[in-house]
Amino acid sequence: MKIQTLLIAFVVLCSSAFAQTKLVEKVVRKGNELVIPYEKYVLPNGLTLIIHEDHSDPLVHVDVTYHVGSAREEIGKSGFAHFFEHMMFQGSDNVADEQHFKTVTAAGGTLNGTTNRDRTNYFETVPSNQLEKMLWLEADRMGFLLDAVTQKKFEVQRATVKNERGQNYDNRPYGLAQEYLAKNMYPYGHPYSWLTIGYVEDLDRVNVDDLKNFFLRWYGPNNATVT
């Protein structure tokens, strides 16, 4: 897949000023250097784009990283970054409920999302001829998520996250070890003193408005890197 094609596809979706896109870094392999060559661009809307080409297989991997994780949560609202990761798969203005999963798998691809303390990322690996479709999916939920958020979806994912905490932490041998470790390593209120999964009482406390405010503050092209 040519670099120019990828750039045009995402710029058309996220920005109207292709000519202003800036190449800010280029790494080239020289000889037998152990280095991954790539080109790094910054779009006029602040989006960072990193491109690495490898034609050994007819596949493309798309990763969108938002520079926000559990460390950006407010005290009393822990677990929200991870909760929001779940909501990002529940449809957007032009993508129906659960359709994101169906579109990627129908294209012969795989997908997932992960959250840690400092970032949240979403990714797909698909046949290379499906690249533009993946970029469109990511652009749609970056720009057009909020109107598709409903109270019903919110409650379903709240229950899902609470169940995930029960399975992986509360009801698992030594599952709370990391939580106790974090509490003792960092003082109260430190953004690393709670786990990404959050506390059940905090998950019960948040509402749809909290979710929308979180999206508006952190989910935008100027806080994202596409690789």
Give short role names for the model-derived ranges:
Residues Q20-F101, F123-V126, E132, W136-A139, ...:
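His/Glu-rich zincin catalytic helix
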Residues Q4, H82, L176-E179:
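Short acidic/polar alpha-helix capping motifs at helix-coil junctions
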